[in-house]
Regions:
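Extracellular beta-strand-rich, repetitive "passenger/adhesive" scaffolds
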Residues: 1-90, 94-114, 118-139, 143-168, ...
């Protein structure tokens, strides 16, 4: 448990390899958290995890495996790994999730995700982005924006790609594609 008004910080030498796990982790209060990981490191959030405040995370690898995000959430994947998030996440605040890496990023691979406010998904490099990938019952309760500005060939933004996947959009959906697609 992270007490109210406390923060998590990366030390002066950085976090360049290995895995930063937030499993059975609870942040009480609404203090904003900001984490920057580099190199070949990964961040795994969940299961049984909750962030009470805003979260800004930039990490080479990202797996979202069952967490509740109460504040504004900004997550950017920057690395080469292929990351399969199990899903089971609930986002209560406005959220932005970006794949700026060369490996793919999957959300909702086993369990549905719920977005209770506006959400924006973007792929900005050569890695594909799979949203609501392989789970039934994904919910998008605010406005949803999908951006593909990826570079390279065959860069894809995929929504509910697999046969098991279902999604309900209760707000407007905007799709922007200015990337390179074959």
């Amino acid at each position: 448990i992270l007490a109210n008004a406390k923060t998590i910080s990366i030390g002066s030498t950085g976090f360049t390899k290995g895995v930063l796990n937030f499993i059975n982790f609870t942040q009480t209060g609404s203090t904003a958290q900001s984490l920057l990981l580099t190199g070949s490191s990964q961040t795994v959030i969940g299961p049984a995890t909750s962030f009470g405040g805003a979260l800004t995370l930039s990490s080479p690898g990202v797996q979202l495996n069952g967490a509740t995000f109460s504040g504004t959430t900004n997550i950017t994947k920057t690395g080469t790994s292929n990351d399969d998030g199990r899903g089971g996440n609930t986002f209560h605040g406005i959220s932005t999730i970006i794949n700026n890496g060369t490996g793919y990023l999957k959300l909702g691979n086993n369990n549905p995700d719920v977005f209770n406010a506006d959400v924006q998904f973007s792929t900005t490099s050569t890695g594909n982005f799979y949203v609501a990938d392989n789970s039934a019952g994904n919910q998008f309760n605010g406005n949803t924006t999908f951006n593909n500005t990826g570079t390279g060939t065959d860069v894809r933004m995929m929504i509910a790609e697999n046969t098991n996947a279902t999604s309900t959009f209760n707000g407007d959906v905007t799709i922007n594609n200015s990337g390179s697609i074959d």
